[in-house]
Amino acid sequence: MQQCTGPLQLPLNNCGVMALDFNSMDGVATSIGHSPLTSLINSGSGSRNSIGEALTNIIWSPLKNELSSISLSANWMWPANNEGENSRLYEAVKACSDFCIDLGINVPTGKDSLSMKQKYPKKEVIAPCFWFMENFTIQ
């Protein structure tokens, strides 16, 4: 999950930028952060690391109003309603909320995939939890 560039879609970019028009210096910047391995160990740390990576990636774009010009989209893929997973999801969302409040960043949007489980006749397989942050700023 990286911003890619060129005809071969090489994952070399930290952020994606787009001009709003041809006549001004205004535009939009986006970046992505994820930390699936950290989320396996500690879901709260995984969500904070995802935010940290997204912010580190977008820092290469000028921000008119510093961090307050950034908005996040929180996306989580989680095997909810399985033993222990609802509390881990709550921990991740709470950590995200607290961290963003401390930084002065809003999270106006997001999406979830909470049915991350595959059922077979004699077995069930749950997917590992995954927290994915996308941030964007309009300059």
Regions found by a protein language model. Name each.
Residues M1-Q139:
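Glycine/proline-enriched, intrinsically flexible loops and inter-domain linkers
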